[in-house]
Amino acid sequence: MNGVAKAPTLDDVATLAGVSPATVSRFLNSPEVVAAKTADRIRAAIVETGYLPNLTAGTLAGNRSRLIAALVPEIAQSIFNDTVEAMIEELSAAGNSVMLALTGADNTRLISQINAALSRRVDAIILTGVVTDEATRARLRAHPVTVIETWGLPEDPIDVAIGFSHRAAGEEMAHFLRARGYRRPHLVVPRSPRSERRASSFATRWMQEGGPEPTRMEVNVPSHFGQGRLSYRALADLPHLPDVVVCGSDWIAQGFIVEAQAAGMRVPDQIAVTGFGNLRMAGDMRPTITSVDVDGARVAREMIRVLRTLSAGETLSERRIDVGFRIIARESA
């Protein structure tokens, strides 16, 4: 005896589960193709033996690494959290590993993370938002990797897009506020393509319906509570006080409301406020925050469905999947 324990093998798992090594291998690569009762026995045997699959060997032997790269701008105070949490839970349960990378608002950093994911031969790259760099889009199309763009709905996706129209969301908010009688909107816009698309479409729709051009200010990303407070103070620089402030995130809206109330302003009686994202705190604020809701968990479910369909060698019925959005009318506007 040399004192070094022998690592459990795939054969050990097969013997304990009462199946062939080929069945265990099939379960590890595609658990959905193994009968449920057999899969349960194999799972129990893996736990009992402490067996760890050799993922590198599996990658070399087949075409799947079972590694998924998820690239998101940020996760702190993020509207993407529901999507990320549901995605990781579902992918992990299916035997995949998730490589989570933060890209921030820097396009150079995004491209770097995409290249890193490609070099690791991932099975899929999940992007938050739409890649605008044409060279990067061409590189992704040239690789045999599934690419899912989420939280956006480009006309010509790289591979698959799951999201909603930011243009439509901006237009709908403009129509909603006009119908509620507001006349002087002010936009607080995070510096991101998604926020800019919503703000631009809001302004266009507002003026089409006979309103004046909205005033606006820009803030850096990621958006946070403090930006909302600063946004309220910046109203002093405007030629007139707006009657409604359209914030690019619920965090900005929350900070704006807190600062407005500290200054003695009544929300929404003297100034109304809307957010975006329908974060949990939006319904806990006083006043509660009118916001735009996107079902992040549904984005994740559609993502898993797409990956399962493609991994099974089946054809998708559609490559642009619209999960929609809805305005949640609350007390702040």
Regions found by a protein language model. Give the residues of each.
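N-terminal helix-turn-helix DNA-binding module of bacterial transcription factors
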Residues: M1-S65
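Append "Primarily bacterial transcriptional regulators
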Residues: V13-A14, I46, S192, I271, ...
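Amphipathic helical "hinge" segments at domain boundaries
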Residues: Y51-A116, R120-A124, A203
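Hinge/beta->alpha junction and helix N-cap segments in small-molecule ligand-binding domains
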Residues: L55, P73-D82, A101-R109, A161-E172, ...
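Flexible loop/hinge segments that line or gate small-molecule binding clefts
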Residues: T128-E172, W251, G277-I289
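Short acidic capping loops at alpha-helix termini that bridge into adjacent secondary structure
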Residues: R184, E213-R216, R266-V273
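Flexible loop/turn connectors
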Residues: L238-A333
